[in-house]
Amino acid sequence: MTIPNTIPITPELIASHGLKPDEYQRILDLIGREPTFTELGIFSAMWNEHCSYKSSKKWLRTLPTKGPRVIQGPGENAGVVDIDDGDCVVFKMESHNHPSYIEPYQGAATGVGGILRDVFTMGARPIAAMNALRFGEPDHPKTRHLVSGVVSGVGGYGNSFGVPTVGGEVEFDARYNGNILVNAFAAGIAKSNAIFLSEAKGVGLPVVYLGAKTGRDGVGGATMASAEFDESIEEKRPTVQVGDPFTEKCLLEACLELMQTGAVIAIQDMGAAGLTCSAVEMGAKGDLGILLELDKVPVREERMTAYEMMLSESQERMLMVLQPEKEEEAKAIFVKWGLDFAIVGWTTDDLRFRVMHQGEEVANLPIKDLGDQAPEYDRPWRESGKRAPLPANLVAAPEDYGQALLQLVGSANQSSRRWVYEQYDTLIQGNSLQLPGGDAGVVRVDGHPSKALAFSSDVTPRYVEADPFEGGKQAVAECWRNITATGAEPLAATDNLNFGNPEKPEIMGQFVEAVKGIGEACRALDFPIVSGNVSLYNETNGVAILPTPTIAGVGLLPDWSKMARIGSANDGDKVIMIGVDGSHLGQSVYLRDVLSSSEGPAPEVDLFAERRNGDFVRSVIRNGQATACHDISSGGLAVALAEMAMASGKGLTIDLSEGKGEPHALLFGEDQARYVLTLPADVADFVCVNAEGGGVPFRRLGTVGGTALVVGDLISLPIQQLRDAHESWFPDFMEGRGELAAAE
């Protein structure tokens, strides 16, 4: 077999494709010859970290992925979970970190576009989006530009496409100065018996290209996303894709219409590594070969090479295996929606991935070795050292508790995110019941009288850095807790694991321990991982990001009329804390923002207590007994109470005199498995008796009423003063009002 090879394959070319010398040797051994330039590009795309998960696969296999409601776990475009009545929720989260740092608007926009395609490729109509964003320190010269671009990109794409953004996170830390994180989540609803998968079945079937035309944008994007950054970062701008949400909306409608005709055998969106990855995955999963004819690919640029067509990451494109007799019907649907429809290949029985271009064979490779048999590493890893305990009596108490609380609610990381989410359409589709700013976003299930879904995304990177195992557990527990705080039953989760360079044993150790913690928490809480994404090499000039294993979860509310909000308390309600008194100040935001310290261990997560306390809180909400509920997380009890008071516009009078421990630990400690409930006075005693009977720790805190948050003689702050501090930081920062705002 002779394949013309016009570009010499040099060690420099191999290295620039992200392939190590031993990986290139493996290619030579596999195919018995030197690869063509196109084949080198194909191997580079399929064997990079972004597509093959070669450093993480071993550990991802340890995660719990099955459960009574799980219809489809990891391995497809998105996870699928049963929500009763013949419906299912389809969801996934994935990163677009590297592109968003280089070109923030398009990087973030195409991150949203890619995750929406993952959902509707499965046959689901998207109903909700979230995004978890991490930026560098506020006074870094690039941060404001990146925040502005990313938020505009997320909003520009999601709003135009027509999906409500119902939640997310925005955090700042110097460790993200050279490597921001954009983790995009989407969920959709489908019929449980009409899920579409990517596994091709049958020989001699047409492989069809759908959607927008192919250009040169994003060539090599997946390879870039598997590398560390250095000073040459600006040169990587051409590897960022450009998105068009209106084309994507047409693609959604055309795909869902086509799926109803019975024409679709397999379907895969073109994401990372474009045509290469989608074709290889469809063939390899179905134990079939694929023959592609690139001359039939719709292009929007002239003289595109086979290499460029195979690796382009142009957006809004799909690949499908079709029932041959339905070809004309399918084509008519796509033409109606103004989209390209082209038969670009066939399935074969030879397990080869063959690519033809201008009459020449430019690639002929073993498809299984590109796909599910790509290299896999068991990288050396080192356990993180344990931090010494930090008793509360060794941590300075604030001179003025009220000032300390104002400082926290008005800080870069605890202040209101209204500036961000008001740029997103949170209400489109008309089903949003809870908007950003609470514990979880809640969306009605269209067509059902009482059913709704709750969504949350969580991780506390400073905890993961201090103790990756406990930090991994805590990310899962907080997500589960936020969903529970609405009254929803947490069903399943998706993970987006963002770490530095896995070739460094200490970074690989963070990853391994965090995955172990995530797995333990998911098992204890019956919260399986059904989809996800790993983003490694998040380093610039050798400085790694904080380890950030984001967990996004979905919960089911059978009757949304009984759900809890954080701001729905009534005057005269009693305030009760479920869980233990605050005692843990290690890694707390009080320590970080008030005392400028990062000492101590992360809080331990008692998963038995999480389960017991959460199940109790959920039952109280579902019985219609709670008027409001909020989980206690960063900032401890004081910040949770302040957020509830600001959300409801009603004051709280709190008495901590029976609390055991130091006052600053009671108020700012970040112990886990805790909630604040407000209950009508005549119900509160009954709930407390039930808690006692169930072995659930609780503390009566006080009463709702007035216009101030009053905690004994320690804090007395008018709600308006809290709101002024809470709401002003973000707009002041973005408008550059007094650079002091950025340096807080």
UniProtKB/Swiss-Prot annotation:
Compartmental location: Cytoplasm
Identify which residues the record assigns to the active site: H50, H96 (proton acceptor)
Which Gene Ontology BP annotations are present? Answer: 'de novo' IMP biosynthetic process
Q: Which reaction does it catalyse?
A: N(2)-formyl-N(1)-(5-phospho-beta-D-ribosyl)glycinamide + L-glutamine + ATP + H2O = 2-formamido-N(1)-(5-O-phospho-beta-D-ribosyl)acetamidine + L-glutamate + ADP + phosphate + H(+)
Main localization category: cytoplasm
Q: Which residues bind Mg(2+) 2?
A: D118, D269
Q: What is its EC number?
A: 6.3.5.3
Pfam families cross-referenced by the UniProt entry: AIRS, AIRS_C, FGAR-AT_linker
Chain positions recorded as substrate binding sites? S95, H96, N97, H98, R117, Q241, E313, S314, Q315, S535
Q: Superkingdom of the source? A: Bacteria
Principal EC category: ligase
Write one Gene Ontology MF term.
phosphoribosylformylglycinamidine synthase activity
Q: Disulfide pairs? A: none
Query: GO cellular component annotations, sorted alphabetically?
Result: cytoplasm
Keyword list (alphabetical) reads: ATP-binding, Cytoplasm, Ligase, Magnesium, Metal-binding, Nucleotide-binding, Purine biosynthesis
Q: Give the record's pathway.
A: Purine metabolism; IMP biosynthesis via de novo pathway; 5-amino-1-(5-phospho-D-ribosyl)imidazole from N(2)-formyl-N(1)-(5-phospho-D-ribosyl)glycinamide: step 1/2
List of residues binding Mg(2+) 1: E94, N533
Where ATP binds, per the record, is at Y53, K92, D495, G532
Q: How does it assemble?
A: Monomer. Part of the FGAM synthase complex composed of 1 PurL, 1 PurQ and 2 PurS subunits.
Q: Which HAMAP family match?
A: PurL_2
| Membership in a protein family | Belongs to the FGAMS family.
Task: Summarize the protein's role.
Answer: Part of the phosphoribosylformylglycinamidine synthase complex involved in the purines biosynthetic pathway. Catalyzes the ATP-dependent conversion of formylglycinamide ribonucleotide (FGAR) and glutamine to yield formylglycinamidine ribonucleotide (FGAM) and glutamate. The FGAM synthase complex is composed of three subunits. PurQ produces an ammonia molecule by converting glutamine to glutamate. PurL transfers the ammonia molecule to FGAR to form FGAM in an ATP-dependent manner.
Name the UniProt record assigns to this protein: Phosphoribosylformylglycinamidine synthase subunit PurL
Q: Which organism is it from?
A: Rhizobium johnstonii (strain DSM 114642 / LMG 32736 / 3841)
Give the gene name. purL
